[in-house]
Structures are given as structure tokens and as C-alpha cells.
Amino acid sequence: MLSRIADSLYWIGRYVERAEDTARLTDIAYHNTLGLGSSPDAAARRQNHWEALIAIAGDPATFRAKYGEASEVTVPPYLTFDTANPNSIVSCVAQAREQARGLRHQIASEMWEVLNRFHLDLQRQRTWQGTWVGAENAHLFYRNVKEFSHLFQGVTDSTMPREEGWSFLQAGKFLERATKTARALDVKYHLLMEETASASGDGIPLELPQWQALLRSFSAYEPYHKLYRTAVRPRTVVELIVLSAVFPRSIRFAVEQVDESLTRIAVACAFDPDTGPGESVLTLGPFAAGTDEAARLAG
């Protein structure tokens, strides 16, 4: 396979996943901060959560230079419609569509149509983005972004031959998922633990909704209760999101999928899987360490 084609498919996988992950985190943050109340303490906590979201996005200096203070007024537009932000939802979909445009004869027409249609929809919404301000409209918008990602993945699963191109696209998708999940968990975990430590008493009544929101941002709330059948606790939340071998949005699951994709590419290229690009990436992390590692992460 030509390196140009492989590179484009890899980045399509990353950009579509990045758009979905940004929609997930922004949607949950928007609704979670609304429930914090209006006291001075709640206002400070609300700002901390918006600053955490900017930290997850990875470019706080650029955001502050343009928007100043992080809030529900400034962060969602920056992460959603700002074309100067290469990681905004609009930018990610535009870049995925641009990569796909050069592959019109290499991918199914349905894949191109999904990306092109959603790109055009987003461009239209940029011109009247003020109409989606408000909790309900924002939720519907971000839900549509997630559904677009799911539609694209479904069309891809149904139409793309399981050859090298498929493996490159999957490698990009799951590498992006592992990276964004690790970054989000790192930032959110420390923020919530600090808030719990400063809360009165044991902090459980105050912080339980925040941990539930963290699970919901990964679509992990129902899987958590199915797998653990216990109350929401920091240790088991970390265990699920980091180490679960069966939850598809866990870091371990995503890294294993990257590993499998690289192995398939190595085999297709006639490399030795033990020494070529398919060499296991699991040896680089704590994913085989079991739940003791989760306990360490949870303090």
C-alpha cells in the first residue's frame, strides 16, 4: 500500500475519534457544571472543570491568549466551532473529510458521503451557532456529533475490506482513543481527588455525581454497574477505564487494538511480527500488571 494512502486512512481514524471524544467531554462538562450551583465555591469549581477540559484538549496557552478565562461561554465555542483550533470538532471533521477526498477511489462512496455530509452540516451550523446555546440544544448538538462518528464507524465496518487500509484506520482510531482517555482520566482524576479532599466529611455525597459524570463521559456508567455491581468508587472507576480487557473505551482495550492492527500490517507486509512494526506495544505499559496497578493509580 502506498504510504500516502496509509497515512490518510490513519489520520481519518484519528480525526473522527477526536471529534467524538471532544463532543463527549464537552457535553458532560457543560451539563455537569450546571449542577454545581451558584455559590462562590461552586463558581470556582465550575471554572476548574472548564480549565481541566482545556488541559485535556492540550493547548491552554492558545486558548487563554484568545479567550481569557475558561467558562461555559468560552470553552464550548473554542472546542466546537473555532477553525483556528486544529483540535476543534469543526476542524477535525474538515481534516478527516480532506483526507478522504484524496481517497475517493480507495474507499466506499458511503464513507465519503458520511464525512462530506457532516462537514457541510457543521459549516452551516457555524453560521448560526448562537441558536445551540443552552443545555438542551448543546446536548442535542453533541449527541449528533457522537452519532455521526458511530454512523461513520458502522459504514466503515460494513464496507471496508479487511486489508492493510483497514488496519491503518483502526490503528489511528484506537491510538487516538487511548491517548485522549489517558489524558482525560489523568486531568479529571486529580481534579476530583482534590475536590474530595477539600470537601466536608468524607466528600462522598458531594463528589458522587462528579465520578458518575466521569463514567458517563466515557459511556461507562452502565458497563461499570454491570461489571462491578457496587457503588461508584475512585479505585474501581480507574480500574475500569485503565485496565478493563472487555470495555471498548478502556486504555488497555484500545492499546490491544492498536497492537493487533500493527501485527496485521506487519503480516501483510511480510515482516516478522516479533521484530517488525507489529512488535507488541503492551510491553510499554502497565496493562498486564492486573488490578494492583489500578489500586496504585487510585492511591
State each model region's role.
Residues 1-299:
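Alpha-helical transmembrane segments and their helix-helix packing motifs
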